[in-house]
Amino acid sequence: MSTSPGARDVTIPRDVEEARRAIHDVVAQQPFARLMGYKVVDAADLAVTLSLPLGLHLMQPHVVHGGAMYSLADAASTFAVLTRLWPEFWATTVEQSIQFLRPVTAQRGEIVAFAHVRRFGKTISFVEATVTFEGREVATARSTQMRQPRPR
């Protein structure tokens, strides 16, 4: 439910184009997402796919740093919730766990995270994410996201 009269009801699903616009807006306004170089591959209501181009800056020493994969999964998970909440609210990660399934040793290409909301709640949402490289799963993550007032 929205908190102010006349505001959009965030419990109502968005169409695909609205969700895509919301996430492109979020990425454009988030300095960390720009610094990391996240690219929006796709977005729909309560689901987001992001990519992260690989490079030497993400390597430690011969594999992609786990923190890069963790961060990508976290961003995709938060953004999946924001497809429904933005611009009225923000979401923050309360908890995230990740399982690294195999190393990524390439210095070129991209890792891709697909996140979808398993349960969208009034305050708390539960999200699952999969990180892939060249179509193979390299990590899976689960997170808990909390709806927050949007910073002004």
What does each of the following model-derived ranges do?
Residues 80-111, 117:
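Hydrophobic beta-strand-centered segment that forms part of the acyl-chain substrate-binding groove
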Residues 65, 113-114:
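Short, glycine/charged-enriched secondary-structure capping and boundary segments
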Residues 2-7, 11-14, 87, 105-110, ...:
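HotDog/MaoC-like acyl-thioester-processing domains
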Residues 52-54, 100, 147:
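Hydrophobic residues in beta-strands and at strand termini
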Residues 1-51, 55-56:
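Non-catalytic linker/capping segments at the edges of enzyme domains
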Residues 34-36, 46-48, 90-96, 109-111, ...:
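A generic structural signal for short beta-strands and their flanking turns/coil linkers
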Residues 50-52, 98, 129:
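Preference for bulky hydrophobic residues occupying beta-strand positions
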Residues 53-78:
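Hot-dog-fold acyl-thioester-processing enzymes
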